[in-house]
Amino acid sequence: MISNFNLSYSLKHVSSCFIFSDNNDPINKLINSLNSNLNLKVRLPSDYNLLADEFLPPNQSVLIDFKDIDDNWFSKAKHLPSLFSNRRSPYFPTLAQKHILESLKTVPVYTIVNDLNEIVIASPRDLTNFNSFNWVKRFYNDWFIWEKDEGNVNIGLFFMNREDAELYLHQICLKDPRGVENVGVNVKTISLDTFYKLNRLSPPRLQFKLIADLQEIKNILNVNSNSRVSFHPKQKYDKNWFKGIPIFIYSPTVTNLDWTLKSNKNMIFFQEMMHIMFQKIY
């Protein structure tokens, strides 16, 4: 069982070293744009996974302008601040979400942390000097105007595959060895419920993304692999992309009476190989 401990996130440490040279990777393209000192525009999928960016025509994408919050200091407040509910997910966790959190405690995911056990965040460079006036303006925007993220956002990445997280760490070390030496960074294993909480409860302009096991996506999109699995009717995918994190479900049937008598619940796997092995056993 994965131990569940408290993690914090920091916008200070190793926030300017996320600049990669591989422009063919859509994730790297996004991070490059976030770290640019130019007012760039980035095309993101509207209702598809970020990894599908390379395969979508322009009319299926949304053009996002990376700019600071509205300079209109006299914007009318849209709501009153609440000290008793979260701004991103006011009703989290519901009863159903509590059950999900409990189930996710045994699922490992990986992220990059510093020596203070703070999650390393990729932050955009501010286009203007962040003085006390800008701080007050942003505070007002966050508490009285903010309804969803627009413009610059900070991103914390989690990975289903440890090797992908280690590759990400390696790129960080290559681009900013001095910063890494000062704060220390390493791959941390945590439980998936921690990511779920951060994803739902993060403050304005801070988002946590879960990166799928890229090898698993490659496997399920392979022609030979497709013969072993069937896709859910609502799953969005094509021959070159797959939305979200692949989850494999084994449903007990009457052909295996012993198993059916023991449990009528579906078994869920995050790796196709484990799913196949389970099918062979039962």
From Swiss-Prot:
BP-aspect Gene Ontology terms: protein transport
Organism: Guillardia theta
Gene that produces this protein: ycf80
Gene3D superfamilies (alphabetical): 3.40.1350.100
This protein's name: Uncharacterized protein ycf80
Localization in the cell: Plastid, Chloroplast
Protein family according to the UniProt entry: Belongs to the ycf80 family.
Main location: plastid
A single cellular component GO annotation: chloroplast
Keyword field: Chloroplast, Plastid
